[in-house]
């Protein structure tokens, strides 16, 4: 398992999230570890990470005030991925994410716009015979079925977080 350094307040945007986010990222980290370690030696020409609702990259837990890595920076710390393909609709979060990712990883492409539209551009960037892990954590229910179909046609494991409530 790869170790993550503690996130630091870099003066950029840090959205607040509920404490549940800590558990979500704990399980994502374990899935990334299992996925990359089991698939890196297989017949794939590359391993890619897709995050269509990427956020700003660092989050502050509302109750404790503790900083946590967001999903795209968890993946950016994993050296086994040959490419990261990230999308964020919110302009401020996109700009912040772009700055943070570039400090950690030079294999990322970051798209600004609606994930359900940008998914077509994203899958074009992934080479044939590659395997992808797509983490989908939509804000509310902003995930189209067509988006799932596009990703599934590209040899991708889909990890989808559907919140049962929003805070």
Model-derived regions, located:
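Basic, amphipathic N-terminal segments that precede the first structured/catalytic domain
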Residues: 1-24
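SAM cofactor-binding core of SAM-dependent methyltransferases
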Residues: 24-121
